[in-house]
C-alpha cells in the first residue's frame, strides 16, 4: 500500500511538473516549486496520500489546460474533488476586507467545502504564498496579509492547526505592522541572549 501511494504521489508530481513546465511565479522561480512546497507542508502534517496529491495538482485545473476529468481519470475522484474544491475557494474574490467580510468569507469557505481537507490544502497553499509574499506589489502584500490575518489564521485556529495559525499570523504581522514586528523581534533576541 505504501509503495502504491508513493507511486501515485510520484505520478502527481510528474504530471504537475509537466503541466507547469513553462510557468514561473512572480518571484521568477519555477512554478512547480509552489505545489511541491504546499505538498511538503501537508506531508509534514501527516496528511493522507489524496491530500498530498491534491496539493501537487491544486493549480493544474486553474492555471493549465488540464480539466477536472483529466485529474479524475488519472488520480481518482477523491483527488479531483479536492482539487475542484481548492479551485473554487481560490476563485472567491473580495475587494475589501472588513471584519464582516472576513466572517462571511470564513463561513463561505466552510459551507462550500464538503470535505474539510479542501480547507486544509487551501491553508497550506496560503501559508506557502505568505512565505513568498515579498514578490508582490506592496498593495497586494498588504491585502493578502490582512486577508490571511482575518480569514485564514482564524480558520486554521478553528481546525486546531495551531502551528499553521501561528505562522500565518506571524507572517501577516510582519507585513501589516513592520515596525512593531521588528521591535518585538529585537526584544525576543535580547531576551534569548540574557537566558543563554
Label the predicted regions:
Residues 1-5, 9-196:
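Active-site helical microenvironments for divalent-metal-assisted chemistry
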